[in-house]
């Protein structure tokens, strides 16, 4: 009996595969992560109980999740938008850093009331982030230079620029630490308790800063643009069929610039919101790889901005819960990075199964069987 593996291109993707992929991906990543926990002599049930249940049932845990979700969601949108246009923005980390640097410069050098200073900080951050993201977009639109390479290389440039500025012109505070001067009260984002009607009666809002409102506004704006406007339709059309979009008179150059500029601005907002809301000053490594974590966030939520939000919250839980597991069980902090890598790996695998229908054909005729003998096959 001969066995043959067959790959047939799918004409349509089954609904269960299209919508179930994110859930199956997360479950598979957690399952393999559980194997790693067993290898470390840690009960996966206990560890995941601490990571998820205790984190989401305590006020401190929920507060930390919402605070960490702000830069993660905004950076996730920075990757999600180009992804909808068929592009890959690997440079969200650099755009986040540039936005944080620009906003910090305004915060420590401009003396204005909070009502004017905060918008100016966020505007400066958006301009810097959009400019940094616009470079790979322009190179791709003008000369078809691979945006993955250029956006990634610009991230390294941003990291070196940050190191120089925090040890030179922007260094502040006491000692020789790579950090800026501390933000004034006018440059600090207020808690939600004083901004949301009835917020004073919600204990959680006392420790969650207004950056959460910025993230929510960005998600709503992205959803409206992508689903209710012609430009959003063109972004999706260019991403699904570049050549057909060109023949229909759509400008892919405009689309490329739009998604990168807006995405870079969102990533920059995440950077300055994290500093003005949580840190109080720009410190080196203030955002531990949030821009790179945005990649699996965008891949998980690539169907809509709402799913990007859910993915951002999931990874925020991973960060906060991972720290708790590290303390409770002595598990290395790299566990969260392992789960992130597994999510990306399984997402890439799922894309293969979305594109191809895998089948196994069994030929039972043998060499001496008549020509009309039948075999069998199994496909999924």
Curated annotation (Swiss-Prot):
CDD domains: TM_PBP1_transp_TpRbsC_like. The keyword Ribonucleoprotein does not apply. It is a multi-pass membrane protein. It is found in: Cell membrane. GO terms for cellular component: plasma membrane. InterPro entries: ABC_transp_permease. One of its GO terms (molecular function) is transmembrane transporter activity. Keywords: Cell membrane, Membrane, Plasmid, Sugar transport, Transmembrane, Transmembrane helix, Transport. Its main location: membrane. Disruption phenotype: Mutant with a disruption within tsgB13 or tsgD13 cannot use glucose for nitrate respirative growth. However, the mutant can grow aerobically using glucose as the sole energy source. It comes from the Archaea. The keyword Ribonucleoprotein does not apply. Disulfide bonds: none annotated. Part of an ABC transporter complex involved in glucose import. Responsible for the translocation of the substrate across the membrane. The complex is composed of two ATP-binding proteins (TsgD13), two transmembrane proteins (TsgB13 and TsgC13) and a solute-binding protein (TsgA13). PANTHER family: ABC TRANSPORTER, PERMEASE PROTEIN, GUANOSINE ABC TRANSPORTER PERMEASE PROTEIN NUPP. Belongs to the binding-protein-dependent transport system permease family. This is Glucose ABC transporter permease protein TsgB13.
């Amino acid at each position: 009996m001969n066995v043959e593996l067959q790959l047939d291109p799918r004409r349509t993707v089954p609904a269960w595969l299209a919508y179930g992929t994110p859930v199956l991906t997360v479950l598979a990543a957690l399952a393999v992560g559980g194997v790693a926990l067993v290898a470390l002599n840690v009960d996966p049930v206990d560890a995941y109980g601490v990571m998820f249940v205790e984190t989401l049932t305590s006020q401190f845990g929920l507060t930390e999740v919402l605070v960490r979700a702000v830069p993660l969601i905004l950076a996730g949108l920075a990757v999600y938008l180009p992804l909808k246009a068929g592009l890959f923005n690997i440079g969200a980390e650099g755009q986040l850093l540039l936005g944080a640097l620009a906003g910090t410069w305004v915060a420590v050098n401009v003396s204005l009331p909070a009502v004017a200073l905060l918008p100016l900080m966020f505007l400066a951050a958006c301009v810097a982030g959009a400019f940094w993201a616009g470079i790979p977009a322009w190179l791709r639109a003008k000369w078809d230079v691979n945006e993955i390479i250029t956006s990634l290389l610009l991230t390294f440039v941003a990291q070196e620029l940050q190191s120089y500025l925090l040890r030179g012109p922007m260094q502040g505070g006491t000692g020789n630490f790579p950090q800026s001067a501390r933000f004034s009260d006018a440059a600090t984002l207020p808690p939600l308790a004083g901004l949301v009607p009835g917020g004073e009666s919600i204990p959680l809002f006392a420790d969650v800063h207004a950056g959460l409102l910025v993230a929510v506004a960005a998600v709503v704006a992205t959803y409206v643009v992508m689903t209710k406007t012609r430009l959003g339709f063109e972004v999706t059309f260019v991403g699904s069929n570049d050549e057909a979009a060109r023949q229909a008179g759509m400008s892919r150059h405009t689309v490329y610039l739009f998604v990168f500029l807006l995405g870079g601005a969102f990533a920059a907002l995440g950077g300055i919101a994290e500093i003005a809301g949580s840190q109080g000053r720009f410190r080196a490594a203030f955002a531990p790889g949030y821009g790179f974590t945005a990649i699996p966030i965008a891949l998980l939520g690539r169907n809509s901005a709402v799913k990007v939000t859910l993915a951002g919250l999931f990874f925020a839980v991973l960060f906060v819960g991972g720290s708790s597991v590290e303390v409770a069980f002595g598990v290395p902090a790299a566990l969260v990075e392992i789960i992130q890598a597994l999510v990306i790996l399984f997402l890439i695998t799922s894309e293969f199964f979305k594109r191809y229908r895998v089948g196994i054909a069994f030929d039972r005729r043998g060499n001496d069987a008549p020509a009309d003998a039948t075999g069998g096959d199994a496909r999924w």
